[in-house]
Amino acid sequence: MVVLVDTVSSTPVRPRHPEKAARPDSLSPKKPDWIRVRAPTTRGYGETRSIVKENGLVTVCEEAGCPNIGECWDKKHATFMIMGDTCTRACAFCNVKTGLPGALDPNEPAYVAEATRKLGLEHLVITSVDRDDLADGGAAHFAATIRAVREHCPTTTIEILTPDFLRKDGALDVVVAAKPDVFNHNLETVPSRYLSVRPGARYFHSIRLLQRVKELDPTIFTKSGIMVGLGEERHEVLQVMDDLRSAEVDFLTIGQYLQPTRKHHAVMRYVTPDEFGGYGKTAYAKGFLMVSASPMTRSSHHAGDDFAKLRAARAALSR
């Protein structure tokens, strides 16, 4: 690994992940042939990037280093990350900056709505950093953003990917009352890997969060996802499926974990496309309305197309 040292600037640059700086490098196996992405060089990519920057917005596509950014931005699809670019947690898999976030921007909901209009989005995905520093975890800001998009882009369907609102009483009720079309909260990994991968979260709290969404509003689609390749066993993935179905979750995503830097959790193995296919078939057999399972699957990848399929699957059940 090459380390670049700034010998010109007098202002010290804060590490993106200060809590990981002292860790030894974690080496991952070489990527197999099926892990391939297109370089982001198209005209559509450039136009999307311009709209994002003009509105002063943050995207999880950039901050998390999503491998699908070239494909999605070429189609003018972007996932907006609200409440800043700095997270209060330090998950071992995540490339988003860690630290003390700044104050919320009260104009951000309007900026998201305006960017949605300019991009012509039929389906919008909104996510956020964890904001454990806020009394409501950012729930009111989520709700305000949903309402702003509804007002300015009434035909756009809205999917949210939320933090867990751990120890934030009443926060979930505020978000659900804003009536997103899809409520996504990712489990990220199997329970046995939480201490090493997602130490600030609680597995069964996340399951209960998803279950509670259905109790508050059964019309909202619920969605969750996990990464594989973090050291989990197959039977553990199947148990996660059962736990999610017990919470009546509609949509499951499963994708390959890719290491952002050598300071992050190592890739323990690359799951083969055939194994992903097997997970997909099993998940459908367990009753999920929609499943996306492949090496390059990510929560927001093809979200608009998947939402159309999700609605069609629910409609077919009610006939």
UniProtKB/Swiss-Prot annotation:
Its main location: cytoplasm. Its cofactor is [4Fe-4S] cluster. It holds the Pfam family Radical_SAM. Residues 16-32 have a biased composition (Basic and acidic residues). Residues 73-289 form the Radical SAM core domain. PANTHER family: LIPOYL SYNTHASE (PTHR10949), LIPOYL SYNTHASE, MITOCHONDRIAL (PTHR10949:SF0). NCBIfam families: lipA, PRK05481.1, PRK12928.1. HAMAP family: Lipoyl_synth (MF_00206). This is Lipoyl synthase. It comes from Rhodopseudomonas palustris (strain BisB5). The gene is lipA.
